[in-house]
From Swiss-Prot:
SUPFAM superfamilies: a domain/subunit of cytochrome bc1 complex (Ubiquinol-cytochrome c reductase) (SSF81648), Transmembrane di-heme cytochromes (SSF81342). This is Cytochrome b. The keyword Transmembrane helix applies. It comes from Eunectes murinus. The keyword rRNA processing does not apply. Binds 2 heme b groups non-covalently.
Amino acid sequence: MPHQQILMLFGLLPVATNISTWWNFGSMLLACSTLQVLTGFFLAVHYTANINLAFSSIIHITRDVPYGWLMQNLHAIGASMFFICIYIHIARGLYYGSYLNKETWLSGTMLLIMLMATAFFGYVLPWGQMSFWAATVITNLLTAIPYLGNTMTTWLWGGFAINDPTLTRFFALHFILPFGIISLSSLHVILLHEEGSSNPLGTNPDIDKIPFHPYHTYKDLLMLTIMTILLLLIVSFSPDIFNDPDNFSKANPLVTPQHIKPEWYFLFAYGILRSIPNKLGGALALTMSIIILMTVPFTHTSKMRSMMFRPFMQMTFWMFAATFLVITWTATKPVEQPFTLIGQMASMLYFLFFISNPIMGWLENKIMKT
């Protein structure tokens, strides 16, 4: 439809009548992004990117800065909310075939990579024990790259070990990357409205559309209100629910935590990394766990867009969702049996979903012909 961007500005964008609550997570991600930028700015004003002062500056923000505890907790728990929303957003895209809008899907995958990088850099900034060791383990994976690995690692660290230059670089990257995320998000929305949103049926909705405002704005506001209430409840009553106990101790390069692990939203990728007992193989599997999302639009073989009428694919999809949760769970456990074996099997099933996707589509087409 021509002039969709102009119509969107006035809330008159025609949208399918049957899009469900699963389509609300895009606007919720926008709200999360706004919250993160605002709280992040106020935290950056008081934060000191120095290995001797970073941990103390976080304590100073929490104890001495007016409403600093609120800003710090909103920023930390807001990141978790961001990832909950983005994982549901991706799952909806996979289930309802939104990935067939290729440009939007590929820009979204790039957004996910950028978001994960930003969150990783942010996790290092408090310079707690788990921050330091998670940074050491993850950045050390660069050394697995043939020929260039050691040079790249030294360049990223700013020396031969994680030290003050590393923290300064990570703070600079954590500050600048959100602006890239905002730019890419704008491109993502523009590309989406070139073709328009999909819908649960996966059909062309041109014959049955309504203006975005007021119908879908109120629907979005309801979910935003629920998310805000949930966020404030966690901030008020359980602000440390997603934090690692080790991160309440200042970073000590001489003491290794019993079990090094990143934030919960990276555990699925970390679990896949851990399931391969080889450094280069693990690093490749970690990268592929995200990059493989880019292959989905090109391996779709079914004549139907949505999984709504595809029982075989529905079963495969929910197995994939369960696999994601199992990998996350095993990554929280020590590297010992039976967790290692469960993690390896779940990691295999994770990649098997993307391989079985085109096969299932082809099989369903065959069944429909008979």
